[in-house]
């Protein structure tokens, strides 16, 4: 107990993590994931941890340990297909982390960062495999944190035909 405050504050908090496979089942059978990790797919997925946090947001990979951090709000309320594609995107970052790549290279803007381009290309390829058209993929790529200019830049980088979408509107 702190004598001045007359309270005890326990400061040894623990961030609770869960095995990836507790929440994300059958990803070892997804061709895109198998392509990422090859023969080690099951082993890698079994080794990934996920941490859910309380803030509104999406998900990302910790550059400290390679674990996936997910907004509990997004997990509960997000579009299931978006969550699936985001997991594919984040698994690319897990692989990049395992390869020792710098995930948050500040020399690049977010949409021009090589690690992000690779992850977005992978997610877009999977979106196309699911049958999503360019307009749906553009909507998937859009977030409130990304300017319209950055969205269009990213869309072009990952080969989304934004001109074709504009013509339809």
Mark where each language-model region is.
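Post-HEXXH active-site segment of zinc metalloproteases
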Residues: 81-85, 97-121
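Short active-site segment of divalent metal-dependent hydrolases/proteases
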Residues: 88-96
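Short catalytic/ligand-binding loop motif for oxyanion handling, primarily in non-cytosolic enzymes
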Residues: 59-60, 95-96, 102-105, 145
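Active-site scaffold of zinc-dependent metalloenzymes
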Residues: 49-81
């Amino acid at each position: 107990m702190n004598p001045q405050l007359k309270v005890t504050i326990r400061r040894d908090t623990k961030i609770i993590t869960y095995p990836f496979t507790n929440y994300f089942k059958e990803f070892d059978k997804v061709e895109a994931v198998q392509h990422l990790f090859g023969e080690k797919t099951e082993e890698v997925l079994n080794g990934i941890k996920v941490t859910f946090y309380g803030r509104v947001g999406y998900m990302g990979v910790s550059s400290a340990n390679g674990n996936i951090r997910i907004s509990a709000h997004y997990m509960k309320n997000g579009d299931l297909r978006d969550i699936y594609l985001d997991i594919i995107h984040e698994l690319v970052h897990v692989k990049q982390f395992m390869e020792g790549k710098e995930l948050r290279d500040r020399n690049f803007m977010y949409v021009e960062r090589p690690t992000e381009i690779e992850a977005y290309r992978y997610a877009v390829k999977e979106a196309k495999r699911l049958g999503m058209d360019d307009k749906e993929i553009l909507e998937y790529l859009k977030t409130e944190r990304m300017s319209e200019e950055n969205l269009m830049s990213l869309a072009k980088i990952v080969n989304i035909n934004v001109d074709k979408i504009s013509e339809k509107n």
